[in-house]
Amino acid sequence: MIHFAKMHGLGNDFMVVDGVTQNVFFSPEQIKRLADRNFGVGFDQLLLVEPPYDPDLDFHYRIFNADGGEVEQCGNGARCFARFVRNKGLTNKHKIKVSTSNGKITLRLERDGNVTVNMGVPVLDPSKIPFNAKRVEKTYLLQTSSSHAMETFLCGAISMGNPHCVLEVEDIEHAEVERIGALLTQNERFPKGVNVGFMQVIDAGHIKLRVYERGAAETLACGTGACAAAAVGQLQGKLNKMVRVDLPGGTLTINWEGEGNPLWMTGPAEHVYDGQIPQ
């Protein structure tokens, strides 16, 4: 049997599996079946804890979307990852260093039960997002065709270990997240697809956000999306260094000292239950 934990970060839910003490492998088809909320465990992403490839690190962190595809980063998942490895006795550290397929991050368990994640330095270089553009801009013009004919969107583009585009909206409640998100997530200017954030600026220290995630549609919360929105808003001169981000599933705090500096995200990580499935 394979033992797992069901966890969530602000309603963004995960199946978390210990690949350190268990020998596990999941095919994309298996992940799709397990992600099904009627016939499987049901989750937005599967998180796999693996031994480190670098002796200076504690673990390797892998993330799989509900469609079975592996992705580079998940901020809400990172907080759950930290809580999981502590709960399962895989480490007794309060500060945990892990690698992902796209870099390294540091996780810190706080006294109040929250987890703070050093999400690394936001990537603005279009070639590294990846995003097809000639140079770095604070705002890009995206054009796309649909049944609504040609549409144009203004967005910020950034990578937090995974690609994001961020659109500002006047009213988050009435934003066309499903339609526009589905339209932009596979836009040809993003060769690896993109997560699409819809940001309403309340004031310089507070935004509301909804995110259409690549491979998972809209989720209750997206940690990297919150980081991307806070960074884009700051670069555009609309937000402070510390920002409260309200998502449908709850609130995150983002702290960024600006270009060239790592971005820090703080929020909860909740354990729901432990389970097991056949090998």
From Swiss-Prot:
Metabolic or biological pathway, per its Swiss-Prot or TrEMBL entry: Amino-acid biosynthesis; L-lysine biosynthesis via DAP pathway; DL-2,6-diaminopimelate from LL-2,6-diaminopimelate: step 1/1
NCBIfam families: DapF (TIGR00652)
One of the GO biological process terms: lysine biosynthetic process via diaminopimelate
Protein name as it appears in the record: Diaminopimelate epimerase
Family: Belongs to the diaminopimelate epimerase family.
Positions marked as site (Important for dimerization): 273
Residue numbers marked as site, Could be important to modulate the pK values of the two catalytic cysteine residues: 164, 213
Subunit structure: Homodimer.
E.C. code: 5.1.1.7
Keyword match Cytoplasm: yes
Domain of life according to the entry: Bacteria
Residue numbers binding substrate: 12, 45, 65, 75-76, 162, 195, 213-214, 223-224
Gene Ontology CC annotations of this record: cytosol
Chain's role: Catalyzes the stereoinversion of LL-2,6-diaminopimelate (L,L-DAP) to meso-diaminopimelate (meso-DAP), a precursor of L-lysine and an essential component of the bacterial peptidoglycan.
Keywords, comma-separated and alphabetical: Amino-acid biosynthesis, Cytoplasm, Isomerase, Lysine biosynthesis
Source species: Shewanella woodyi (strain ATCC 51908 / MS32)
InterPro entries linked: DAP_epimerase_AS, DAP_epimerase_DapF
Single Gene Ontology MF annotation: diaminopimelate epimerase activity
Localization per record: Cytoplasm
Reactions that this protein is recorded to catalyse: (2S,6S)-2,6-diaminopimelate = meso-2,6-diaminopimelate
Catalytic residue list: 74, 222
